[in-house]
Structure formats: structure tokens, C-alpha cells
């Protein structure tokens, strides 16, 4: 029973962490106060505001306080769904205005075509929202790559460091765990996916990166799927 689907992490795997940390995060932090003020009556944004109040256990938090909480979460790189949803909406404006394009490592761009030729399904799994992932890949340095993906997963699927998230992916794409390969740079994510029965490979693009006992590669050029 061979590999039929590959699931890739984004930050540090398909995309340079510096793009996330030095471009996307600061952009969302700077734009956040005005965005919330202008869009607080939007149903999706209003739902996110309510979710922030619930998570923070501050049901009566004002808009200014919610903004403060979200800015703190950005600073902490908190993987909270309402934050990731709002960031995705803010980044959508930035991409649309041409303020930046999505960084994708060239080796992954080249590999995508090969996966399609092999008949493999390709999915991404990120703590960033599905919307943010679609924006990243549709506004990439190499153009629109979204048609090369079969789907995307985010925190609504589960915490990337917990086994259940990967079991949920298995159920969603209707394959057995051993037919799925997960590639990530984060050891805890690989351990969780491995516990769920998936094949795993660690992407190590930086020599200072913490590694474990899993197979490692330095680029997608080195990933051979039979």
C-alpha cells in the first residue's frame, strides 16, 4: 500500500519562516486596530470578537480590549482560531493591494508538478487559517498555485501537536494512515502524526533546527515517493 497523499506544513517547510515572522505578522499587527474598528459589524469579524472574549474569559471586553488581547496573541504566536481568521482577512487586503507576495521555496514549487504527475493528492496543514493558506499559495512569488492542491487544513481540524488532528485528516480525505505522508519542520507535529499512523519526514532547512529519529530532508528535491 503506497503513498497516495502528501500533507505539508507551511511555515518552515514550504514557506520561509522569515516571511511569516518579518512580513505577515507585523503587517497584521499594524493593520489590526483599524481593521477591527471598520469591520466590527461584519458577521465573521463579530463572531471572532465573541470568540476572543470567550477564550480570554472576558465576556464584556470592549473592542479596545479585544484588540489588545489579539495584539498580545500575535506577539506570542498564539494558535487561536479567531486570531488566525482575522489575520487571514487582513492579509487578504495586503495581497490584493500588492503590498507583498507569498514566499514559497522554489524546490516545493517544482515538486508540486511532480506530485501531480505521480497522481498524488496534495494538502497543506497550517495553524494559519484555510483562507490564509489559499491566499499564500494563490499570490505566491510563482503565481497562483492553488490548483495544485486538493485541499487545506487549519486549527479547526485540531491542534497540530495532537494525534487527533491527523486522525481527523485521515477521516476527511478517506485514506488509510499508511497512505499519507506528512512533512513538517516541527518535531512535535511529526510525533503526533506518527502516533496517528502517518508516514512522516522532517524538513530541516536550518542546521540549528531540533531533530529526532525521523527521516530528514533539506529540500523537497530529496523527497522520493514510490
From Swiss-Prot:
Its cofactor is Mg(2+). InterPro entries: Enolase-ppase_E1 (IPR023943), HAD-like_sf (IPR036412), HAD-SF_hydro_IA (IPR006439), HAD_sf (IPR023214). Binds 1 Mg(2+) ion per subunit. GO terms for molecular function: 2,3-diketo-5-methylthiopentyl-1-phosphate enolase activity; 2-hydroxy-3-keto-5-methylthiopentenyl-1-phosphate phosphatase activity; acireductone synthase activity; magnesium ion binding. It is an enzyme of class 3 (hydrolase). Its EC number is 3.1.3.77. It catalyses: 5-methylsulfanyl-2,3-dioxopentyl phosphate + H2O = 1,2-dihydroxy-5-(methylsulfanyl)pent-1-en-3-one + phosphate. Disulfide bonds: none annotated. Monomer. NCBIfam families: enolase-ppase (TIGR01691), HAD-SF-IA-v1 (TIGR01549). This is Enolase-phosphatase E1. It comes from Shewanella pealeana (strain ATCC 700345 / ANG-SQ1).
Amino acid at each position: 500500500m503506497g503513498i497516495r497523499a502528501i500533507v505539508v506544513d507551511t511555515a518552515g517547510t514550504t514557506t520561509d519562516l522569515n516571511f511569516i515572522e518579518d512580513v505577515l505578522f507585523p503587517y497584521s499587527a499594524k493593520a489590526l486596530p483599524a481593521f477591527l474598528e471598520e469591520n466590527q459589524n461584519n458577521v465573521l469579524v463579530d463572531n471572532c470578537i465573541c470568540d476572543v472574549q470567550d477564550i480570554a474569559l472576558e465576556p464584556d471586553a470592549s473592542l479596545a480590549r479585544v484588540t489588545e488581547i489579539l495584539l498580545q496573541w500575535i506577539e506570542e504566536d498564539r494558535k487561536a482560531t479567531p486570531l488566525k481568521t482575522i489575520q487571514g482577512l487582513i492579509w487578504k487586503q495586503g495581497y490584493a493591494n500588492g503590498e507583498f507576495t507569498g514566499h514559497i521555496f522554489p524546490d516545493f514549487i517544482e515538486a508540486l508538478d511532480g506530485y501531480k504527475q505521480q497522481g498524488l493528492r496534495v494538502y497543506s496543514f497550517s495553524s494559519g487559517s484555510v483562507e490564509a493558506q489559499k491566499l499564500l499559495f494563490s499570490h505566491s512569488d510563482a503565481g497562483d498555485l492553488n490548483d495544485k492542491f486538493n485541499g487545506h487544513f487549519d486549527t479547526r481540524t485540531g491542534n497540530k501537536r495532537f494525534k487527533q488532528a491527523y486522525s481527523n485528516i485521515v477521516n476527511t480525505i478517506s485514506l488509510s494512515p499508511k497512505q499519507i505522508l506528512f512533512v513538517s519542520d516541527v518535531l512535535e507535529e511529526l510525533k503526533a502524526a506518527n502516533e496517528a499512523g502517518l508516514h512522516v519526514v522532517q524538513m530541516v532547512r536550518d542546521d540549528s533546527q531540533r531533530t529526532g529519529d525521523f527521516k530528514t530532508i533539506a529540500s523537497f528535491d530529496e523527497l522520493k515517493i514510490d
